Amino acid sequence: MVDLPTTTPPAQPTTGNDEVDALHPLKPYRSLENEVLQQRIEAVRQELGDELLILGHHYQQDEVIEHTDLRGDSYQLSEMAAKSQACRTIVFCGVHFMAETADILANRPDRIEARDGRRVDVLLPDMAAGCSMADMAAIAQVEAAWADMSEVIDTEQVIPVTYINSAASLKAFCGRHGGIVCTSSNARAVLEWAFERGQRVFFFPDQHLGRNTALTMDITEEQMPVWDPYALEMGGNTDEQIQSSRVILWKGHCSVHQMFRAEHVDRFRKEHPGIKILVHPECPREVNDIADVSGSTGKIIQTIKNSPAGTKWAIGTELHLVNRLKDEHPEQEIHFLSPVVCMCATMYRIDLTHLCWTLENLRDGRLVNQIRVDEETTKWSLIALERMLAVK
């Protein structure tokens, strides 16, 4: 085990390839046993104390989540980052867009002023931890779609809404155009906010969350055309479809929740009489419509927590979370809804190896994999995020 320095030098951000520029190269960490990695992670946590805040998303592996200070879903983690006070560094055990959001919210002007001008650094243990859904909507595509639809509708009356599972550039787009960010926790409240301010909503990048939420507001499927960014004209729609729309949905989805099917629900109800189906609203409509309960990651956790012993559940969300709920609630019968493994592969990239490597470089004065959003993007993203945080 490496001897810990008696003082912590000021951390310096790296440039270029972080794995090359790091004081401690990544490669030697790959051969360490998990027990050794865990000991070294805890040693750094103890040394840095309140100066370090490790945030973990519920989809993380158990071996990673046990080393986090706070855990939550996208919405909860956004609030945690916004409220950070004493810490100097946030290490985000999640994916890239989450770390971007943490950088924006933790470094709001009022927060920086309260810290006498000091920023909070945000680190992502593995820069390859992205999000396939977020990648389905590039800013150039969204801007092109906005320009195209402006030929047939008044975009001054369109409120753009981006799911928090999106790049900071899309959040900034919403900020510039009077729009807002949403999460699966507050999607309905956000859509209500939007319809108070415009005639239509342009919802991206997850079509399923947008559709499932809008259906609870008496908006019909026919009023929700899907915009395909690769279609030749008008996102694959007629002018009339766009003109008669209430919500224009982006053709994007979560690759995990897309895997769940109505036939999975039917099978469990047939084989396990009395079982309840609990799903995330990122699931397709065919699943969401026939589930007993649909809700955010936070709602899924609370639903299980508040259910009596003996309750039977089949849960349609990320595998690591379902397995953790099963372990934490042995008094209930919990099943994974799909016969196919539905795991967030990019979230899985955050492991003990990368976490230990990140922390020991931080301890010894080097920031690796720092996430820092540029000032212009931060400015407009923050506007959209603050609108979201103000929605009740």
Swiss-Prot record:
What SUPFAM superfamilies does the record point to? NadA-like (SSF142754)
Sorted alphabetically, the Gene Ontology BP terms of this entry are: 'de novo' NAD biosynthetic process from L-aspartate
Q: Which UniProt keywords apply?
A: 4Fe-4S, Cytoplasm, Iron, Iron-sulfur, Metal-binding, Pyridine nucleotide biosynthesis, Transferase
Protein's UniProt name: Quinolinate synthase
Q: Which family does it belong to?
A: Belongs to the quinolinate synthase family. Type 3 subfamily.
Instruction: Provide the taxonomic classification.
Output: Bacteria, Pseudomonadati, Planctomycetota, Planctomycetia, Pirellulales
Q: Which residues bind [4Fe-4S] cluster?
A: C131, C254, C344
Q: What does this protein do?
A: Catalyzes the condensation of iminoaspartate with dihydroxyacetone phosphate to form quinolinate.
Q: Identify a single GO molecular function assigned to this protein.
A: quinolinate synthetase A activity
Per the record, the pathway is:
Cofactor biosynthesis; NAD(+) biosynthesis; quinolinate from iminoaspartate: step 1/1
Can you tell me which residues bind iminosuccinate?
H57, S74, Y163, I164, N165, S184, H280, P281, E282, T297
Annotated InterPro entries = NadA (IPR003473), NadA_sf (IPR036094), Quinolinate_synth_A_type3 (IPR023515)
Reactions catalysed, semicolon-separated, are: iminosuccinate + dihydroxyacetone phosphate = quinolinate + phosphate + 2 H2O + H(+)
| Location in the cell | Cytoplasm
EC number in record: 2.5.1.72
- Cofactor annotation comment: Binds 1 [4Fe-4S] cluster per subunit.
Q: Give the UniProt entry's GO cellular component terms.
A: cytosol
What this protein needs as a cofactor is: [4Fe-4S] cluster
